[in-house]
Amino acid sequence: MAAAFSHVIFDLDGTILNTLEDLAAAGNHTCEAHGWPTFAVDEYRYKVGNGMLKLVERFMPAEYAGDGRMFEQALAEFRAYYGEHKEDHTAPYAGTIEMLDRLRAAGVQLAVLTNKDHVSAAPLIEKYFGSERFALVQGRVDAFPPKPEAPVTLHVMEELGADPSTTLYVGDSNVDILTGHNAGLKSAGVSWGFRGRAELESAGADYVVDTQGELAALILGE
């Protein structure tokens, strides 16, 4: 039986890789350097998801809102620290590699679309998943507005030769559900990520799954 979806586009952070501790460490390192308040790791679950620029904006104190010079300094510091420490605690979620291999064996084409800077996303995919599992990896670049805006998703689909009716976007946040819908795709939410089932259902996810096995069965039409 043919798979229900021929192409699947995955979010990165909170979906296939647990990057939260390293993102939090980079954020708190930047905060500490300026004497700003720091945050518990779990608080970063709601700061990430819209790219590094938004993340920095969210951990900076409100008194610096609109201070472009301070923002650029904090962004540069965050990027430098994260670039050196992005693999300290990061790891694929259990069962993810097996799921990806099961999908590839069934002929499903896989891609990654993330708001993480491309210069960080591409090496992480290479390290943890190799070069053969994903046909395309697209991180944040200046040529496109970030997710959930449609242009970058449409670009990925064009590169893949994907049909919207048989393409699924998979992620862990409301941003990801909107990313799929804004490009005319079905969206699946994974409850093991940074945000959880309630946010995914509230955002209008077409599907919400709790395990990698459930996700594979959904994609394969089993």
Each language-model region and where it sits:
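Asp-based, Mg2+/Mn2+-dependent phosphohydrolase catalytic module
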Residues: 1-6, 104, 118, 122-222
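N-terminal helical cap/lid subdomain that shapes the substrate entry/recognition surface
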Residues: 2-98, 105-106, 119, 131
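Small/polar loops that bind or transfer phosphate-bearing groups
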Residues: 11, 19, 48, 112-113, ...
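Hydrophobic, well-ordered secondary-structure segments
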Residues: 13, 30, 79-88, 111, ...
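Conserved SAM-binding loop
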Residues: 16, 92, 110-113, 169-170, ...
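Basic, gly/Ser/Thr/Pro-rich low-complexity segments located predominantly at protein N termini
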Residues: 40, 54-56, 100, 176, ...
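Short amphipathic alpha-helical patches
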Residues: 50-58, 67-71, 79, 83, ...
